[in-house]
């Protein structure tokens, strides 16, 4: 297995080429329990779930033919959730409600050792260090031709919330008012360390150096999330008798995405501390300009206020089921979470907060069903930009937010043939096309993916207790990129999946 990351250099995308093992393995177990009890005044429902995840990821982290550094990350993760919802049994026609409590707990034991190899030692450690040592002093060298930087973590996360929604029917209006009070706690215990032996060219023996970066961090967030919405039934005349309805709606709500810790940056932190420790032995500076502390591992919650207006027209007549909807949205965000990469030859990536951002756009959907025929289509345009974002080096205000497509288009059509035979019961054929608009990959807007189309088709044949299906994706074999990142100062793109055909069988007893 591996990761299809292509080096981008001098305006050219090079073929996927790296020399160390890259693979991913996962074991996941999920289970849940649902219960419901109805009394004289309340209906109570409860949902409990549990998830166990164990995975292992091997990574050639420089993604080049050089032997620079590799990583093996393993996780043991345990998640428990509990939600209880209360609904009144008896209520007036004009009012209804639901209230609930939610609790969530997650424990994650993670180990992510980074192994520095010969090319990585020479370029990232010795190369940078010797660049700041006068030649007459001598040259720095290491006894090891490879060594690990171990990083062990324990993450605890909990979330408790209480929420309520009330629904008011006033003539043609349906009004909703609600809130959610959310409290989250995040804890991280970390222990990163490395042991090496170094010397200057004039020294006869190597000197041991042990570097440790250990401690714990915690964060707590309390959020009040209100919500208001209104739906107006604008059906007029004989529309209801003709099986038609027309509704308009508007809503405003506040949401948030929780903060957390950047575990991927710890090898960079320890590498800088290690270089600083060696140089201090000789009374010199390390020359590092991107030295980080534990504070750099934190990022804040992202909070947004979402405004939306729209309408929906529906028709149910003579076997036809037709729905057409359109909406416009305007979202204001504070502390927008974005992925950034350390300057220079850093090996990790981290989540950071931009100042403010805004997104606005339009969306439309269509769905038609008639006998065995079905047609679906959706389209959207989005303009997502930073309003205030300065990373200390550049001002990116008014630039496009990376990874956000400027437009999307999807359409599919198919027909289901019903035979009712003893052997073949039905067959369904569907074709679809997708267009993804321009995507900017970096905050400066210098790298982008131009719009591209993909096409697909699938066939499903139903037998008693068994379905056979075959699916073709990206039938035109379009070439496009789906992800961008940087490592050791190099830029990489992840290529999209090529033309492929999948066949399978599903069984039901």
Regions found by a protein language model. Name each.
Residues 1-98, 104-106:
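Outer-membrane beta-barrel domain signature, strongest for Gram-negative TonB-dependent receptors
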Residues 34-39, 43-49, 54-59, 238-240, ...:
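Membrane-embedded beta-barrel scaffold of Gram-negative outer-membrane proteins
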Residues 244-245, 256, 371, 422, ...:
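C-terminal beta-signal and adjacent terminal beta-strands/loops
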Residues 46-50, 99-105, 177-183, 248-254, ...:
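Transmembrane beta-barrel strands of outer-membrane/channel proteins
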Residues 31-37, 82-88, 162-168, 220, ...:
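Residues on the lipid-exposed face of transmembrane beta-strands in outer-membrane beta-barrel proteins
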Residues 39-87, 153-217, 221-234, 368-381:
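Surface-exposed extracellular loop regions of Gram-negative outer-membrane beta-barrel proteins
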């Amino acid at each position: 297995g591996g990761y299809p990351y292509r080096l981008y250099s001098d305006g050219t995308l090079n073929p996927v080429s790296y020399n160390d093992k890259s693979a991913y393995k996962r074991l996941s177990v999920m289970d849940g329990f649902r219960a419901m009890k109805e009394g004289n005044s309340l209906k109570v429902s409860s949902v409990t779930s549990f998830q166990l995840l164990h995975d292992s990821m091997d990574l050639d982290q420089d993604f080049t033919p050089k032997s620079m550094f590799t990583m093996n990350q393993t996780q043991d993760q345990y998640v428990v959730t509990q939600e209880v919802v209360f609904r009144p049994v008896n209520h007036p026609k004009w009012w209804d409600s639901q209230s609930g409590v939610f609790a969530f707990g997650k424990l994650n034991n993670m180990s992510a050792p980074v192994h520095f190899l010969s090319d990585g030692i020479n370029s990232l450690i010795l190369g940078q260090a010797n660049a700041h040592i006068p030649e007459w002093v001598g040259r720095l060298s290491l006894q090891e031709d490879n060594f690990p930087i171990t990083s062990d973590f324990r993450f605890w996360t909990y979330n408790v919330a209480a929420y309520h929604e009330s629904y008011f029917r006033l003539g043609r209006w349906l009004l909703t008012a609600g809130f959610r009070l959310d409290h989250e706690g995040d804890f991280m215990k970390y222990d990163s360390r490395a042991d090496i032996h170094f010397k200057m060219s004039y020294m006869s023996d190597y000197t041991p150096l042990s570097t440790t970066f250990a401690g714990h961090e915690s964060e707590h967030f309390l959020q009040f999330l209100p919500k208001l919405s209104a739906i107006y039934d604008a059906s007029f005349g004989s529309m209801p008798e003709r099986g038609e309805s027309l509704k308009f709606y508007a809503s405003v709500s506040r949401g948030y995405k929780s903060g957390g810790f950047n575990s991927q940056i710890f090898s960079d932190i320890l590498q800088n501390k290690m270089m600083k420790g060696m140089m201090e032995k000789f009374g010199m500076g390390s020359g590092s300009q991107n030295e980080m502390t534990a504070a750099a591992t934190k990022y804040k919650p992202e909070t947004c206020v979402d405004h939306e207006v729209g309408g929906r027209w529906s028709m149910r007549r003579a076997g036809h089921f037709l729905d057409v909807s359109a909406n416009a949205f305007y979202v204001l965000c504070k502390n927008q979470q974005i992925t950034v990469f350390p300057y220079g030859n850093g090996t990790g990536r981290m989540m950071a907060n931009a100042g403010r951002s805004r997104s606005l756009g339009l969306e439309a959907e269509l769905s038609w069903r008639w006998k065995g025929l079905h047609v679906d289509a959706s389209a959207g345009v989005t303009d997502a930009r930073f309003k205030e974002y300065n990373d200390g080096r550049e001002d990116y205000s008014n630039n496009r937010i990376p990874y956000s497509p400027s437009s999307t288009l999807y359409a599919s059509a198919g027909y289901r043939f019903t035979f009712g035979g003893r052997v073949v019961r039905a067959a369904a054929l569907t074709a679809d096309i997708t267009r993804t608009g321009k995507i900017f990959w970096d905050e400066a807007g210098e790298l982008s993916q131009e719009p591209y189309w993909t096409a697909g088709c699938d066939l499903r044949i139903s037998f008693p207790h068994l379905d056979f299906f075959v699916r073709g994706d990206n039938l035109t074999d379009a070439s496009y990129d789906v992800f961008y990142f940087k490592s050791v100062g190099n830029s990489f793109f992840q290529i999209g999946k090529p033309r492929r055909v999948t066949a399978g069988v599903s069984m039901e007893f």
